[in-house]
Amino acid sequence: YKRQIYFASLGISGYLAYYFIDSYLCLIFFFIYGTIWAFSVSNWHETVHRTAFKTRWLNEIVYHISCFMGDFEAYRWRWSHTFHHSNTYQTKDDYDHDIQITRPTELLAFFLNFIPFADLLFPHKLLKYEIIKNSFRKLSPVIAITAPDSEKNKIVWNSRFYVFLWLVIIAYSFWIGSILPVIYILLPNYYGKPIQFFVNVTQHLGAPFDKKDHRESTYSVKINPIFAFLYCCLLYTSDA
């Protein structure tokens, strides 16, 4: 029922943004809507581990929906996340592509995460850009490291499916003469990211480097109930 509340909250905030479209209030509700949308990354994380629901098929459905929402191509990220859990903070040899903060830390890029739309200043770093490249079979290095050859065609064709849906949304916006479909579906990750990033970046804070023993990578955080709900209550964790 918690994920039902999540999607209901997304729908209600989206409706209120549209209802107040002629008022500055719409900016507040779009920010709320974008923030809830951006937290789809938490749904993605719990469903890839199949801990959100009791049944595998329901986890799989919500996983694919959340992947599309968060620009996480489903097959690429299933394998890269498996690789991520083979180690703690991995700094040697093959790099862990699931870690949000680079080493050495790019401070400008880090702080820009707290500014809406700042990601668009670096289009070559966007997940959408990676998906577009993958759709042309120009597979990213992380795929070569983590995904078996048998999965690469799935990554290519699913990337093409994502790009097709994006083009349909853009074409529909032109057809109806409104940018709203783009604002509602293609841009929320960019204007709704600041709070989501602030919460999500706690996920690996304090983890030791290059340790196979995941018992050394436990952590606890405390956040308010609303953010905890959006974060799927990922507050007490062993990174295993």
Residue ranges and their predicted role:
Residues W44-R50:
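His-Asp-centered metal-binding catalytic motifs of divalent-metal-dependent phosphohydrolases/nucleases
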Residues R50-T51, R56:
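Membrane-anchoring hydrophobic segments
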